Regions:
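Acidic-and-aromatic substrate-binding clefts and catalytic sites of carbohydrate-active enzymes
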Residues: 36-38, 63-65, 201-202
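Domain-start "cap" segments at the beginnings of catalytic or binding domains
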Residues: 31, 44, 75, 185-186
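Divalent-metal coordination cores built from histidine and acidic residues
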Residues: 41-150, 215
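Di-metal (Zn2+ and/or Mg2+/Mn2+) metal-binding site signature of metallo-dependent hydrolases
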Residues: 20-44
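Active-site neighborhood of phospho(di)ester-bond hydrolases with catalytic His/Asp-centered motifs
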Residues: 23-30, 57-60, 88, 123, ...
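Histidine-rich, glycine-flanked metal-binding segment
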Residues: 1-25
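Histidine/acidic residue-rich metal-binding segments in metalloenzymes
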Residues: 104-124, 130-196, 200-222
Length: 223
């Protein structure tokens, strides 16, 4: 796509958009489709009219109930939709070692999913104490993602100081749990990206408005 003089011979396909507006679609960088209580196709139908053309989903809710079969279902059910659905593979199933879940996914269970073209990395590392402590099983999951050059999402509300240093050093590249500008700025200064969340359960946009100024803006995403 471009502006200027082009000939139809240069294009595989052309469309006359005279009198229309053209703008890029929104990409939601962190979402749990299951929380909407909709199947992927119905979620796409609801989100597209509002300008969202792609999402990066973490299916840890269905994975905590159905295990690998739940992840497989989400990948299959999102195939060929007009809204592109990328996925992060859940890192914490169960969410914590104290939980009783419908499944337990180890590194060898999630490793095959990294070969899928719409899988972008490892989902939010909620067990931040395990990450900071160098837990062997979690370390193996993070290493698998890093070896493939894939992203590792974070989830560490109110974590600060040396504990945050250890969490970031474990390989966690971002966080969407910041509820104050000070909390978010510490993460950015220490190398993470911050997802500014304005969702159904948590609305942090107002508190994080200072991040829209340089030098912080380039390290932020809206989700």
């Amino acid at each position: 796509a471009g502006t200027g003089d082009y000939s139809e011979e240069d294009a595989d396909d052309t469309e006359d958009i005279s009198g229309k507006y053209l703008c890029p679609g929104f990409i939601d960088g962190h979402i749990h489709i299951e929380s909407s209580m909709l199947l992927p196709a119905e979620f796409a139908r609801a989100a597209l009219p509002h300008g969202t053309t792609a999402v990066v989903a973490d299916p840890h809710e269905i994975a905590n109930v159905c295990g690998s079969r739940g992840i497989e279902f989400m990948l299959e059910a999102s195939e060929g939709l007009p809204l592109t659905m990328y996925f992060m593979i859940p890192s914490c199933v169960p969410s914590t070692e104290f939980d009783e879940a419908g499944a337990c996914l180890e590194a060898e269970d999630i490793r095959p999913f990294y070969d899928h073209p719409r899988v972008l990395g490892l989902g939010e590392v909620m067990s931040y104490h395990a990450a900071a402590a160098g837990d062997r099983k979690l370390r193996e999951k993070i290493d698998d993602a890093e070896k493939r050059g894939l992203a590792v999402n974070g989830h560490a509300p109110l974590l600060s100081g040396r504990m945050l240093d250890r969490y970031i050093a474990a390989g966690v590249g971002d966080d969407h749990e910041c509820s104050s500008a000070e909390e978010a700025m510490e993460r950015i200064r220490k190398g993470q990206r911050v997802m500014i969340r304005q969702g159904t359960a948590a609305r942090n946009l107002k508190e994080l408005l200072p991040l829209f100024e340089e030098p912080f803006a380039g390290r932020c995403l809206l989700v």
